[in-house]
Regions:
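Hydrophobic, aromatic-enriched alpha-helical segments typical of multi-pass transmembrane helices
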Residues: 1-2, 201
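Active-site loop/lid in soluble adenylation, ligation, and acyl-transfer enzymes
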Residues: 2-155, 264-270, 274-301
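Catalytic cores of nucleic-acid ligases and guanylyltransferases
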Residues: 38, 94-95, 193, 220-228
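Catalytic activation segment of kinase domains across protein kinase-like and atypical kinase folds
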Residues: 206, 210-251
Length: 301
């Protein structure tokens, strides 16, 4: 039986390491950037001690799928390790299916969030104020209700800890009105297209978080796109208003951490094998459903 290796730390001889996020490690490749998606998993903004098999490959290949599906400028050059420079190809066994060569961008210091359903922090905000990020919504909506139309709710980009929701006017103060309006339009367009496609696969795209930056002065989609880490997907068959529907992400991990009364501060605990296995299967299921089946390597080709 094949056992998928788990990658939680990545350092590559001959490639300068630039930075690491909760999941991704970045390396310099000339003027470009190599983004390696590891199998690390964070919950409640804390990285767990062990990784999730297949997670990094699923996130990387799904982002590639969406970059190619969406008709918007993006930073992707290639996900095919065999097309990358020799310094990268030297690490092909580690990098295949989990590495992306991209153009360097100057990121905007905001997260661009689109919400089509009332869930998560949006639901909490609505219960207190009747609005989400300053956007007033109809009275009497229930948890997980579909919104009359998708809304744009930007957030600050936190290096550590939680992103914080901000109003559109606050975003304007950070990036300028013209840029803010363009980012809002792009975000809502991408969400609408992604949600329509997901619907054909029996999924509801409840919300998503996108990042943009400037490449040669042009607004460009960067980072990850419409993955289970950046988006909330629900099986349409299980959707009900008034409850939080099951999602294709790390819910098993969050439920486990709540059951052990995790303090939500580092270090993260070691996840038990059953939680790891069920979480891995959720990520792989999302990949199979969204891409029409097949294996990671089939999509790579």
């Amino acid at each position: 039986m094949h056992t998928e290796p788990v990658l939680t730390q990545c350092r590559l001889a001959g490639l300068p390491h630039l930075a690491s996020g909760k999941v991704r490690d970045m390396f310099a490749v000339g003027d470009d950037l190599l983004v390696v998606t590891t199998d690390r998993l964070s919950a409640f903004d804390v990285v767990m001690a062990n990784g999730i098999p297949w997670k990094g490959k699923v996130l990387n290949r799904l982002s590639e799928f969406w970059f190619r599906f969406l008709d918007v400028p993006n930073h992707l050059l290639t996900c095919d390790v065999d097309e990358m420079p020799a310094t990268v190809r030297a690490h092909a066994d580690i990098l295949r299916d989990r590495a992306m060569l991209v153009r360097r961008a100057e990121p905007f210091p905001v997260e661009c969030v689109a919400r089509g359903y009332l869930i998560g922090s949006g639901w909490s905000d609505y219960q207190k104020t009747g609005a989400v990020c300053g956007i007033t919504l109809p009275a009497g909506l229930r948890q997980a209700a579909r919104l009359p139309e998708p809304i744009f709710t930007p957030a600050t980009k936190a290096v550590t800890g939680h992103d914080e929701n901000i109003g559109f006017d606050e975003m304007v103060a950070v990036v300028g009105r013209e840029t803010a309006e363009r980012l809002r339009a792009l975000t809502l367009s991408i969400y609408t297209r992604g949600a329509a496609y997901a619907e054909t696969k029996g999924l509801i795209l409840a919300d998503t978080k996108l990042e943009f930056g400037l490449v040669d002065g042009c607004i460009t989609l960067i980072d990850e796109v419409l993955t289970p880490d950046s988006s909330r997907y629900w099986p349409a068959a299980d959707y009900r208003e008034g409850i939080s529907p099951p999602s294709f992400d790390k819910q098993f991990v969050r439920d486990y951490l709540e059951s052990i009364h995790f303090a939500k501060t580092p270090p993260g605990p070691t996840l038990p094998p059953d939680v790891v296995a069920r979480t891995s299967e959720k990520y792989r299921e999302a990949f199979r459903v969204l891409t029409g089946g097949g294996t990671i390597h089939a999509l790579a080709r």
